[in-house]
Amino acid sequence: MRKIRTIEMKRLTVEEFREIEKMPLVVVLDDVRSMHNVGSVFRTADSFRVAGVVLCGITGRPPHAEIHKTALGAEDSVSWRYFSTALEAVEALRSEGYTILSIEQVEHSTKLPSFRPEHGRKYAVILGNEVKGVHQEVVDASDGCLEIPQLGTKHSMNVSVTAGIIIYEFARELVFD
């Protein structure tokens, strides 16, 4: 086997990326404090052609050196916007026709392996603060909650890891299927 060189990958330019059809998924970051997490979410969003990233509250915003370091420029290709609270973002996204799903451990959550996104529907997934998770009022305003089943002792994952799993599962169901 031979590794594929970067030049052989036929990557899109930022301009081409902006024009190409996106997966009908928006990732909302609710008071995420780590710039590393923010940058990683941008980079993963670029990898899977996510429609956009919504930054809320204390979540860092581009331009920012720490975000850029992890995003590797994906903050320039992926569409993003800012709201002062995630609840404001939820209201705006709902008015735009998005189904709102918080990624949180709650009573009666849907386990990710059981979830099947519908083709033709737009989704917004909300990931919360590294310590407190998604704000309760945002959970209350959501159409549902998804949970990633876990087997270890911590029952929590890094925000960017969670985002990667969620985004990949949406891509697997909506794009690669």
Where are the regions that the model predicts?
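Post-transcriptional modification and biogenesis factors for structured RNAs
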Residues: M1-D177
